[in-house]
């Protein structure tokens, strides 16, 4: 993490560098003042010797005041504590038949200091949604920390239509209103799964500026211009009470000139300032772009990308990655391959914190649980906040300690490698909104 922290000290903007120039003179002045205070105390008229120990990292000396006073060893040490861990806000969404997998993903991602919104769309049966609702309401940890919410009034979600964007905006608005303080918003599906513990993720992101947005994007839309941008689609999920697939109208439209189109992955990790921006839309760009994408095929793969790359204040905050391991055809099709045990080592070697797409009860998930997350069946992923024992199959998180304690493992080193690569001179600025 020292390399990562050192790198970010270099990429801070000029104003921040200028603001820090007064720190060294202030520190020197403070030390001199304390030194004079020490001398004053040592030579006090009462004749009593009063010692005031103080410290500055890396400095040791002996102070002599008159020959009758013994040398005083002054150990000056400034303890540098690690930065506070961020708080993450997750949306985990699913459709019919995803209830059990959604629960598993939630348990694998759980940490008391994070916030979670879960959603099963209206294609799911009432029984499946009630089962998830009961699970959230009755889980001991969720009850105690009150940080898991379910969208009870379910939305229709069509992946290829704007209803998925609407659902993401819905969850983000709930988290802004009810989720308290958090730093990044992460949207996942029930088919996603973590490859690292939350302690690994929180530790690594402690050292990053909180305004970074991890979003895979490009303006080179290629074939998508003729197949997605120019055709006009209608998503019945916006106005019908039953789910139906999108349909096309005969007329086509020209490419927009009021803003530039971008495309990329539908999965992202967005900063709170950017989430505030696209929910509130104070310069109206997010609303204008949203209305345009209401008739755009696969709008989740373009809406947020187009907004962030056309909003001047956020363009330079983008990191061109979705932080996922995904196995695609070449050229990519609508959906990626389902991951299996054969993909396990490639997942680990990717250094990505998340992977998709998994089938329910795929054996590779058990391998991820045991070898990467150290999670037992039916339990949350343990972290530094879990101080119970594992004896006789006990849940270590049944006994809760300090929730601010983070104990990163090998997963943190893998994420650090990925982040260092993404923020290198060759990959960071040159790949922003191009």
UniProtKB/Swiss-Prot annotation:
Transmembrane segments: 22-42
Cysteine pairings via disulfide bonds: none
Topological domains annotated Cytoplasmic: 1-21
Membrane topology classification: Single-pass type II membrane protein
Main subcellular location: Golgi
Lumenal side: 43-434
The organism's place on the tree of life at top rank: Eukaryota
UniProt keywords, alphabetically: Glycoprotein, Glycosyltransferase, Golgi apparatus, Membrane, Signal-anchor, Transferase, Transmembrane, Transmembrane helix
GO cellular component, one term: Golgi membrane
EC number: 2.4.1.-
Record's subcellular location: Golgi apparatus membrane
GO molecular function: glucuronosyltransferase activity
Carbohydrate-modified residues: 138, 187, 316, 392
Family: Belongs to the glycosyltransferase 14 family.
Record's function text: Beta-glucuronosyltransferase involved in the biosynthesis of type II arabinogalactan (AG). Modifies both the beta-1,6-linked galactan and beta-1,3-linked galactan present in type II AG.
Name of the protein in its database record: Beta-glucuronosyltransferase GlcAT14B
Source organism: Arabidopsis thaliana (Mouse-ear cress)
Gene name as annotated: GLCAT14B
């Amino acid at each position: 993490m020292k390399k990562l922290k050192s790198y970010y000290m270099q990429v801070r903007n000029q104003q921040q560098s200028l603001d820090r120039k007064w720190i060294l003179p202030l520190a020197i002045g403070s030390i001199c003042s304390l030194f004079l205070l020490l001398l004053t105390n040592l030579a006090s008229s009462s004749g009593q010797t009063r010692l005031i120990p103080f410290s500055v990292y890396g400095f040791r000396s002996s102070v002599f005041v008159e020959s009758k006073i013994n040398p005083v060893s002054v150990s000056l040490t400034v303890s540098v504590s690690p930065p506070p861990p961020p708080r993450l806000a997750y949306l985990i969404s699913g459709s019919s038949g995803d209830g059990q997998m959604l629960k598993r993903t939630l348990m694998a991602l759980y940490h008391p200091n994070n916030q979670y919104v879960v959603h099963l769309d209206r294609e799911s049966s009432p029984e499946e949604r009630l089962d998830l609702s009961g699970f959230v309401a009755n889980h001991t940890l969720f009850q105690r920390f009150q940080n898991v919410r379910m969208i009870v009034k379910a939305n229709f979600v069509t992946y290829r239509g704007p209803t998925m964007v609407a659902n993401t905006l819905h969850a983000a608005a709930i988290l802004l209103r009810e989720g308290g303080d958090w730093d990044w918003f992460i949207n996942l599906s029930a088919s996603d799964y973590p490859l690292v513990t939350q302690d690994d993720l929180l530790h690594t992101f402690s050292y990053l500026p909180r305004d970074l947005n991890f979003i895979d994007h490009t303006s080179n839309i290629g074939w998508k211009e003729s197949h997605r941008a120019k055709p006009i689609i209608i998503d019945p999920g916006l106005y019908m009470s039953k789910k139906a697939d999108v349909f096309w109208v005969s007329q086509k439209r020209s490419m927009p000139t009021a803003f530039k189109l971008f495309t990329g992955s539908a999965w992202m990790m967005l900063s709170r300032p950017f989430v505030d921006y696209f929910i509130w839309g104070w310069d109206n760009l997010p609303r204008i772009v949203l209305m345009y994408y209401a008739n755009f095929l696969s709008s989740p793969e373009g809406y947020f990308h187009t907004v962030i790359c056309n909003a001047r204040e956020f363009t330079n905050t983008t990191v061109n990655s979705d932080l996922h391991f995904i196995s695609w055809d070449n050229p990519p099709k609508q959906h990626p391959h389902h991951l299996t045990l054969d993909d396990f080592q490639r997942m680990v070697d990717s250094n990505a914190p998340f992977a998709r797409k998994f089938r329910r009860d795929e054996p590779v998930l058990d391998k991820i649980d045991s070898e990467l997350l150290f999670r037992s069946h039916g339990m949350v992923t343990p972290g530094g906040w879990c101080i119970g024992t594992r004896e006789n199959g006990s849940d270590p998180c049944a006994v809760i300690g300090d929730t601010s304690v983070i104990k990163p493992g090998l997963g943190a080193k893998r994420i650090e490698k990925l982040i260092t690569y993404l923020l290198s001179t060759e990959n960071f600025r040159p790949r922003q909104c191009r």
